[in-house]
């Protein structure tokens, strides 16, 4: 008989489950399949009465294409939702979009110029809606388990009305107030900014030591003595109205040359080096309180200002004497109020100086540093000038520097609700305790929330001013009336109608006016727990999951708003992920030139490999993107796919039936139960990288050991042999486990695999299946087999030596003389497990026996003597030869 006859007699099947994935084609095919069959909707109907699990989607900003961070975020959420859904929970996933704010407004203004507020708002609204549609189309390519017809967006009348209901609640609780305070001000945006809208970037500032002349002295200082002042913002010297000292700090009056100077004693040596003072003389020592009330001459204008006490004075840097410009610094402001200092505002909204700047009026604040320095130089008031590079606040949208600037603004008091916030944080589950501390620091230690913005595209602050220009906050019926109008017409009504048209009849024609400011956009997204319609579900929701920057953003505003409205956190658990960085650890972005388009990645690799990269990342840290890392995930995917293909192919003739297992088959079945348990535990902990690693490691071990030893049974035994069916039962068990296990991560591949699985009560989609439950794992059985693997390792070391010396080609050519006293080892089929020709037991050392036995041409195993083929193959062939000859 020829070789082809033997080959054709083996149990070798073909499969339509291809080795090549063709993911790009299959992504579209299965996405269409899921949409056509309304799989998401069917899942929700099926799970409707089950326990709920709600992951609330934080809304991305509706501007521009999605970036790799968007894709990472949505996929991580989708993995959780898919797993929870398969685990039996009712878990609707409702995507949202944040639509108001400066980027869109600026884009529209650049397109149409400075038109009316109504026109800017109309165009901004249209643009935001178009961007939602564009981003939605891109998000669909990520194979998310959701219905993009059921979304929420912050510019709908219903959402806006609910947002204003929450604002009304804040007002009714006495939390909203208006005050003149220095706040972050962005000249580039011409608006106030909250802390959440600040990004710290490197910036070069002047480091200037100048002097102020004392006008009238006392027992410690004299007229014309010079106060040494340090500043990095010379432009604020125009608004100077006082100098602060530390009451209990020690100060010195020193003489250098012809001049007398005053500075902190602890900083004298340091400054003497900077000023190159070689021969100074200490004239007197005194505490800071000794010169309180002393007057000095303003460095620029002809006016007199006082020395006052300041708790913020530090001896770390500077001179121990701090220049105060009360409308340009928070500490300055409070000290100015306490001491009735003059409040000078010389900077307009656009950052240019007004008439209060005298000869410098019309200058942009940053450009004036040079001019003011030159002015002081001419008056011989500069002791030292250098430049420092330091971290400086910038507008997170325009990336331009911001300043502290005193303007009348609206605030929400955080001080009044701090205890409530602390209590709410205690109820939140965090994966790590340091994350709890981070949120606490961001929320509880923050200043009062600045909620007003001087822009057009946003939700209006629905506040009226009476004829005396006082805000009307004590008329709830006015708020209710406006909210009803917004619910019907949208927030545009505030700008379309006159003040009287917006008021209930009894408050009309009283000479009232309306507020022009809008609410902080973080207020918009921060009410989504209440304003978004998530399948009629109410907070607290199970998880909020966003980038780590949201501790000061969405996590923060959502918590504050929910505590004010409901009295509890809107989320039970908080998860966060890092940023996507390149191979060098640099954050990826278009502006840095290292950004990567996720749509191009999807086109090249397919969605499942992209999702595998996400799952296989330690997302709680920054996530590295590189071609090399993607190729590693391609290799993992290939291993999974090839293993699945082997399983499917070798189950072609298997009908799902349970078989009693023994020996190694029982050991492997037990291992599969452990695999199931570990997968469940890590999905429950949202440790997807561990899920991937566990699956990958199992496949490697399974292939290297079990598949190696059972291929002979699968291919060469009778089709219906019990041994073969026992092996197939394990293959079937593993195939089902892998299919379900990868479904949350790789939905396309899981769906394709499912189409090849035979089972009773099969669903229309794998994603409608139930996730497997935890199973009993026999630790004693598992431990018992450790003894075998120790023997296997030692035997194979000896066999490898024979192969390296070219005495043999394969392990199945040799015999093993094995030293062992173990009853367990003697009870198992070592010939099969070690894949050798024979095994004998010995009292001496373990040896490899070189045999010159005959090779069976059908199964390629070696035997002492065969009659054309081995006995097993002869028995198989004796049944199929008549079939071949018929």
From Swiss-Prot:
Binding site for ATP: 590
Source species, domain of life: Bacteria
Positions with a binding annotation for Zn(2+): 856, 859, 870, 873
One of the protein's GO biological processes: isoleucyl-tRNA aminoacylation
Positions bound to L-isoleucyl-5'-AMP: 546
EC number(s) recorded for this UniProt protein: 6.1.1.5
Motif stretch ('KMSKS' region): 587-591
GO MF annotations, alphabetized: aminoacyl-tRNA deacylase activity; ATP binding; isoleucine-tRNA ligase activity; tRNA binding; zinc ion binding
Example of a GO cellular component annotation carried by this entry: cytosol
Catalyzed reactions: tRNA(Ile) + L-isoleucine + ATP = L-isoleucyl-tRNA(Ile) + AMP + diphosphate
Residue window of motif 'HIGH' region: 60-70
Coiled coil start-end: none
Cofactor or coenzyme needed: Zn(2+)
InterPro entries for this protein: aa-tRNA-synth_I_CS, aa-tRNA-synth_Ia, Anticodon_Ile_BEm, Ile-tRNA-ligase, Ile-tRNA-ligase_type1, Ile-tRNA_ligase, M/V/L/I-tRNA-synth_anticd-bd, Rossmann-like_a/b/a_fold
PANTHER family: ISOLEUCINE--TRNA LIGASE, MITOCHONDRIAL, SOLEUCYL-TRNA SYNTHETASE
UniProt family annotation: Belongs to the class-I aminoacyl-tRNA synthetase family. IleS type 1 subfamily.
Subunit field text: Monomer.
Name of this protein: Isoleucine--tRNA ligase
Gene that produces this protein: ileS
